[in-house]
Amino acid sequence: MRLAIQLAAATRGQTSPNPVVGAVIVKNHQIVGMGAHLKAGEPHAEIHALNMAGEKSKGATMYVTLEPCAHYGRTPPCVEALIQAGVARVVVAATDPDERVSGRGIEMIKSAGIEVIQGILEQEALELNEPFFYSVTEKQPFVTLKIASSLDGKIATCTGESKWITGEESREDVHFLRHTHDAILVGVNTVIADDPTLNTRLPGGGKNPIRIILDHHLRTPIQAKMISDNLAPVWIVTSPACDVNQQKEFEKRGVKLIKMDETPIRIKSLLEVLFKEGIQSLLVEGGGVVNDSFLRSGLFNQVVVYLAPLLIGSQSAPSSFSGLGIESLEHAARLTFKNIESIGNDLKITAVRK
């Protein structure tokens, strides 16, 4: 099962809207087949493993990180393939919360006389697909707030200089973080100040997430890099009252305008809209104002902070969170440290909501 989890982990960022899944087939104490789900619409991990094992699948044990699917989607049900192959035992790490599966796969396997063992390395399997599980059950995206700051919580100097607070190694790690999310969200002030591309620059490539700009008054410069680079779709969340001609200029360039008649835009409403648009995981790379909006809404799942060993000072220097903030410690967002690691000269701190 540990190997199956490793196979699944290697595909993070590639399979959305499907979960990452790994499978290993063992017979007579030898691995005879293995596989991972590589991309939505392509064969699932179980099918790759069965194809590799061939006739050796009969009487073998399959270890799989997620309950095999029992429904017809882009591909046929994996349960039927397992039964037809004559697998004798299926060891499942975690059940699938998708209402189309949700225990049905396991019941179908048992009904065919195949032994099923559940819960092996379950916690590791759950963590591997945390955004998928959350979005399926809560009907909204899994939200990660990403922050790069000095020790005193500053994200730029008082003159606006921010390149670069963190080191090169941290910035490279951010590209993998982007790769594992469906979309990146920033505020229009970040676009105006930094003109970012928000793409993924990994060795050997990587997935470029959808880029979302919060821009109620449609102030995004038409000449901004991401508007014309064609690296990934750009969505602008704006007001339906914005200038019609300006809207047409963006639409001519392939920009999707999501019009929300709220001032300011409520984070809950935004997440509901994004979920309906197919976004399961959202990486927020906004400035202090956008971060503060998510903080006050309480609608975020984890925070990833890249902390550089420098002090900037100045009351006027932008902070990780700005705006009204939380008035009482009683209402402060309580988190738990999940992981702390050194990356170059920086610290990467991952904290999750309690």
Describe the role of every protein-language-model region:
Residues 1-2, 7-12, 16-18, 34, ...:
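Enzymes that bind and transform nitrogen-containing heteroaromatic metabolites
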Residues 7-10, 52, 131:
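Solvent-exposed, charged/polar functional surfaces in cytosolic regulatory/catalytic domains
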Residues 13-17, 41-42, 106, 120-148:
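Proteins enriched for Cys/Gly/acidic motifs involved in redox and nucleic-acid/cofactor modification
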Residues 15-29:
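N-terminal glycine-rich anion-binding loops that anchor highly charged ligand groups
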Residues 21, 80-82, 149:
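Short, flexible segments with low predicted structural confidence
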Residues 25-124, 210, 230, 235, ...:
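Zn2+-dependent cytidine deaminase-like catalytic core
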Residues 99-100, 126, 291, 313:
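Generic structural signal for helix capping and beta-alpha/helix-loop junctions
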